[in-house]
């Protein structure tokens, strides 16, 4: 009873407050949805003419494909709660044979092992590397192991090389980070790219032991806390999309907001904070593609989800004086091209069932130029006609930044060549669609501490300003959703504190 009364009081304290959310990707939309559900007035500003950010689904000529993220997971609790609240469980779509994933080794796709027995018999790794993996729990006991210095900038490559050897880095870690962040293990900072594993090593020494114990602890918590949740069982099934593509998620979030609460084609040019009162201290101006500039109503708080490279271009005022953003560091972004191709089934001589195939950097010596390919119609048979295979191939990233910028015709030849080696495709694809992401992902490199410090400085120096998105906390869809939800919680706490500061002291 007491906790319920407190919750009611908190809702009453923030109800009706006005919050501006800049950016209508999943971070911004998740934040806006959570704020609105708590009774706040929300306005979302999006520079593009659509919502979704890096989630883009296309339906065309009987095909459905994604030009950004193709799947997501439910590793973050905020994701499951959001799916339940939005009623999206019935639209979830789980890939067929998603455990069948492949890595190229010596020019040939090899299925990744999913358990220790499969690891022993797999040809992905040498016998020496297999033993190193199996012995890691015994070799890396907490008391006798030298773990990473908390202040050290260890790369992903160095971290996994210490635990499992160089071959594991070359043939497992390298293709994985290439496929998930378009980066390479030498460039990525371990503590920013894999913070959970970074912390697991601190606690357990062995990351295998730590991962297993953490997983079982999480399962135990879920069994106690979410027994009645309809999505608990489904949430354990790994990667998923939605019927109609990933765009369904932002579109559904958008529908939860009114027309007046979503401003598309609204690029924010400036923000201004004035500390004259404890409410509605923020104002912002934006411009549309036809150069129409407008000043918007005042707000009590701002959640910024735009990329930091765009934030640097904004004019920020504080108390009538310019608030310089020159402390924001330059961020490296990975360029990426996505090529969607179709082949008639009779032209694919060695089709593979499963999720997809990733290509290690070392396999470039065999002529491969792409990062990997998703077997889109194998995962989701309703994404193409029954006589057609649909493939989604990724090109570029840190491995080949110039190739990412190539023309559609050039990339078609590159992709067709790789698919010929991998799957035995013959001839030209029936259809080709190309989308180029100039800045697909921020690179969590060795200097990323300075980025996090800059974000903290903005939030500390600008009352009521909060940052969310894939520049903080992770690149995945789930991490981005969690980031937006956490920013919404911080806004609510901030507004509650402002409300409490305004109240007279009524203690006896």
UniProtKB/Swiss-Prot annotation:
Its EC number is 1.3.3.4. Its cofactor is FAD. It is found in: Plastid, Chloroplast; Mitochondrion. Catalyzes the 6-electron oxidation of protoporphyrinogen-IX to form protoporphyrin-IX. The keyword Cytoplasm does not apply. Residues 1-22 form a transit peptide. GO terms for cellular component: chloroplast; chloroplast envelope; mitochondrion; plastid. This is Protoporphyrinogen oxidase 2, chloroplastic/mitochondrial. The keyword Transport does not apply. InterPro entries: Amino_oxidase, FAD/NAD-bd_sf, Protoporphyrinogen_oxidase, Zeta_carotene_desat/Oxidored. It is an enzyme of class 1 (oxidoreductase). Residues 219-239 are annotated as: Disordered. It comes from Arabidopsis thaliana (Mouse-ear cress). GO terms for molecular function: oxygen-dependent protoporphyrinogen oxidase activity. FAD binds at residues 23-28, 46-47, 68-71, 268, 475-477.
């Amino acid at each position: 009873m007491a906790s319920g009364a407190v919750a009611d009081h908190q809702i009453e304290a923030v109800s009706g407050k006005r919050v501006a959310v800049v950016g209508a990707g999943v971070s911004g939309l998740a934040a806006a949805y959570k704020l609105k559900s708590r009774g706040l007035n929300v306005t979302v500003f999006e520079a593009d003419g659509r919502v979704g950010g890096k989630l883009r689904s296309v339906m065309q000529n009987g095909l459905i494909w994604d030009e950004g993220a193709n799947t997501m997971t439910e590793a973050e609790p905020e994701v499951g709660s959001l799916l339940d609240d939005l009623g999206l469980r019935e639209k979830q779509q789980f890939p067929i044979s998603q455990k069948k994933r492949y890595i190229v080794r010596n020019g040939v796709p090899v299925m990744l092992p999913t358990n220790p027995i499969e690891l022993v018999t797999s040809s992905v790794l040498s016998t020496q590397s297999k033993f190193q993996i199996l012995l890691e729990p015994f070799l890396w006991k907490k008391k006798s192991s030298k773990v990473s210095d908390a202040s050290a900038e260890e790369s992903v490559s160095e971290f996994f090389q210490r635990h499992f050897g160089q071959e594991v880095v070359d043939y497992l870690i390298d293709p994985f980070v290439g496929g998930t962040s378009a980066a390479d293990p030498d460039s990525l900072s371990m503590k920013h790219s894999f913070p959970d594993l970074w912390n697991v090593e601190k606690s357990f020494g062995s990351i295998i032991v730590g991962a297993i114990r953490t997983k079982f602890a999480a399962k135990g918590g879920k069994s106690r806390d979410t027994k009645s949740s309809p999505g608990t069982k489904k949430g354990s099934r790994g990667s998923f999309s939605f019927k109609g593509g990933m765009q369904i998620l932002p579109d559904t979030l958008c529908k939860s907001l009114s027309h007046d609460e979503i401003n598309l084609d609204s690029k924010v040019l400036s923000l201004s904070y004035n500390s004259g009162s404890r409410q509605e201290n923020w104002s912002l101006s934006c411009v549309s593609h036809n150069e129409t500039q407008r000043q918007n109503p005042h707000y009590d708080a701002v959640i910024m989800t735009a990329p930091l490279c765009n934030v640097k271009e904004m004019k920020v005022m504080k108390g009538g004086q310019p608030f310089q953003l020159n402390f924001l560091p330059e961020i490296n972004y990975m360029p990426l091209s996505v090529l969607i191709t179709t082949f008639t089934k009779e032209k694919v001589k060695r089709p593979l069932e499963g999720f997809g195939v990733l290509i290690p950097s070392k396999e470039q010596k065999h002529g491969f130029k792409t990062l990997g390919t998703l077997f889109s119609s194998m995962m989701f048979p309703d994404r193409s006609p029954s006589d057609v295979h649909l493939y989604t191939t990724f090109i570029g990233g840190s491995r080949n930044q110039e190739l990412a910028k190539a023309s559609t015709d050039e990339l078609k030849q590159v992709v067709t060549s790789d698919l010929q080696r991998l799957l035995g495709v013959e001839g030209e694809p029936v259809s080709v669609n190309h989308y180029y992401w100039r800045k697909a992902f921020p690179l969590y490199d060795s200097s990323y501490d300075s980025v996090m410090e800059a974000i903290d400085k903005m939030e500390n120096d600008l009352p009521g300003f909060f940052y969310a998105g894939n520049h903080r906390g992770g690149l995945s869809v789930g991490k981005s959703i969690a980031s937006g939800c956490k920013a919404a919680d911080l806004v609510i706490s901030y507004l509650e504190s402002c409300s409490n500061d305004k109240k007279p002291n009524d203690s006896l």
